[in-house]
Amino acid sequence: MIMRMSSLFVRTLREDPADAEVPSHRLLVRAGYIRRAAPGIYTWLPLGLRVLRKIENVIREEMDAIGAQEMLFPALLPREPYEATNRWTEYGDGIFRLQDRKGADYLLGPTHEEMFTLVVKDLYSSYKDLPLSIYQIQTKYRDEARPRAGLLRGREFVMKDSYSFDVDDAGLDVSYQKHRDAYVRIFDRLGFEYVIVEAMSGAMGGSKSEEFLAKASVGEDTYVRCTLCDYAANVEAVHSPPIPPVPYDDAPAAHAEQTPDTPTIETLVAHLNERFPREDRPWAASDTLKNVVFSVHHPDGATEALAVGLPGDREVDAKRLEAHLGEGVVFEPFGEADFAARPTLAKGYIGPGALGEKKPAGVRYLLDPRVVEGTRWVTGADAAGSHVIDLVAGRDFSGDGLIEVAEVRDGDPCPRGDGGTLETARGIEMGHIFQLGRKYADALDLKVLDEQGKLVTVTMGSYGIGPSRAVAAIAEGTHDELGLAWPREVAPADVHIVATGKDEHVFAAAERIAHELDKQGVEVLYDDRPKVSPGVKFKDAELIGVPTIVVVGKGLAAGTIEVKDRRTGQRQDVPADHLVDRVIAIVRA
């Protein structure tokens, strides 16, 4: 096919859009791939739609190759299936809800586990029907509170979601591995750097879960890698290596001390070193126990107070806490009104003595795993200007449970205990695969008869990829200072022909080259605009980012045509009579 710039519905921009936060957003708008319709909602222009469709086709080919079958569900979904799994409530404000004229409740589909489960339940009843893998590529909707970064965090997005159905866990393992292998092939073909990391299941439920992250400094996801082994995990899924209990038979008794004007860890440590110096080493923030209290609002309207106890040199990671609390839960640190309602909590001096579900304040108290039995701490004495020294975990206090929400830092030990340390990096979530198990099958009563004629609950896997997000992720990973630079597999065209000058022979030669390439199945973007300067055409070619640029211009008089590699910048002058063969060889290499 030949796309002509003179008639193509595109308008390139020289200035960055005012709301662009990341390079992919800026360049996709400037190059005429997408246009903003509303916050988090974008229109796909012809060039952008071509890239999106190519990504979808790569996904489709690899899904078909493992025997998955494509289908399509509606985007407008009834309330009842989501009530059965409790996700109508769990999603909270995160979904778009609406009613028809009769008052019946619906939602715009954020994900389709329930619908896939029900259609299989309607049609299949025997183990002989399984295993089964089915998928769709469809638009999803989520009411993001803060849509940002263009296509990376939107309210409307395209997603491929597939589901496997097996009669037992061994079958699920096989289906999961097939999908995982297919995802590796998909991301290898899409042409950007990625990493596979352990992940949390979140609202999806289930057990084993992995994410495919595009490496990107602008990514919203933080992940860690071990410096020695192959361990990699989303920061939300990182677990601290087990710490053995510390003997405390000889530990001194806990004692309260006056520590005026020390409501922060920094002021407390300074006071300790001034008033209670130690011979072996100075006091440090890691010697203190920080107790951070949150007001937690659940989607069903319930509110609770939650305290997290962690070493004073660590902060609570909001994303880790969000992942722990679940979909639709909103939280914020205790405010003045919250403290006023619980007078036993002394702001800046909160200690374990006032915390716990059975204490008067009724605050659920969860401890970081580093607060192991026998460890000694300095922490609040539940009175202004006072702290307790030598408070021993397990002897003097305990929590209602454990929670892993402290920030993960470079240099932390690898959870595998191999002596390696963790290093952090940023990425964009491109794919997420889950072993759902029987969560949705149980909720929706999906059962089949096994070989013995006994009803058994089907076990499921869920596998998602975001094609629209992939457009942005690829742009993030491959752009340069001049513009986009697409991998050939997903580029809107194979070749961008630029005819320069006003010579009719130049345009005639460019036209002939375009047709000859088209006959050979090469996709051509042809800049045939007669009244546009060469400089503007060159800038547009660099901005649009087609992988091979052919410049037909002044070299034609000498019998040569320039061929440029967009990603490397390498140029070569090719004899005009060999040009088509050379370009075809480049495209098909």
From Swiss-Prot:
Quote the subunit structure annotation: Homodimer.
* Protein name in UniProt: Proline--tRNA ligase
Q: Which domain of life is it from?
A: Bacteria
Q: Its function?
A: Catalyzes the attachment of proline to tRNA(Pro) in a two-step reaction: proline is first activated by ATP to form Pro-AMP and then transferred to the acceptor end of tRNA(Pro). As ProRS can inadvertently accommodate and process non-cognate amino acids such as alanine and cysteine, to avoid such errors it has two additional distinct editing activities against alanine. One activity is designated as 'pretransfer' editing and involves the tRNA(Pro)-independent hydrolysis of activated Ala-AMP.
The record's CDD domains line, in alphabetical order, gives:
ProRS_anticodon_short, ProRS_core_prok
HAMAP family documented for this protein: Pro_tRNA_synth_type1 (MF_01569)
PROSITE patterns reported in the protein's UniProt record = AA_TRNA_LIGASE_II
Q: Which Pfam families match?
A: HGTP_anticodon (PF03129), tRNA-synt_2b (PF00587), tRNA_edit (PF04073)
Q: Which family does it belong to?
A: Belongs to the class-II aminoacyl-tRNA synthetase family. ProS type 1 subfamily.
Q: Print the domain comment field.
A: Consists of three domains: the N-terminal catalytic domain, the editing domain and the C-terminal anticodon-binding domain.
Enzyme nomenclature, EC number = 6.1.1.15
The species this protein was found in: Nocardioides sp. (strain ATCC BAA-499 / JS614)
The record, for Gene3D superfamilies, names: Anticodon-binding domain (3.40.50.800), Bira Bifunctional Protein, Domain 2 (3.30.930.10), YbaK/aminoacyl-tRNA synthetase-associated domain (3.90.960.10)
Q: Please provide one cellular component term from the Gene Ontology annotations of this protein.
A: cytosol
Q: Which InterPro entries match?
A: aa-tRNA-synt_IIb (IPR002314), aa-tRNA-synth_II (IPR006195), aa-tRNA-synth_II/BPL/LPL (IPR045864), Anticodon-bd (IPR004154), Anticodon-bd_dom_sf (IPR036621), Pro-tRNA-ligase_IIa (IPR002316), Pro-tRNA-synth_IIa_bac-type (IPR004500), Pro-tRNA-Synthase_IIa_type1 (IPR023717)
Q: Name one GO molecular function term.
A: ATP binding
UniProt keywords (A-Z) are:
Aminoacyl-tRNA synthetase, ATP-binding, Cytoplasm, Ligase, Nucleotide-binding, Protein biosynthesis
Reaction equation(s) it catalyzes: tRNA(Pro) + L-proline + ATP = L-prolyl-tRNA(Pro) + AMP + diphosphate
- Gene Ontology biological process terms, A to Z: prolyl-tRNA aminoacylation
State the compartments where it is located.
Cytoplasm
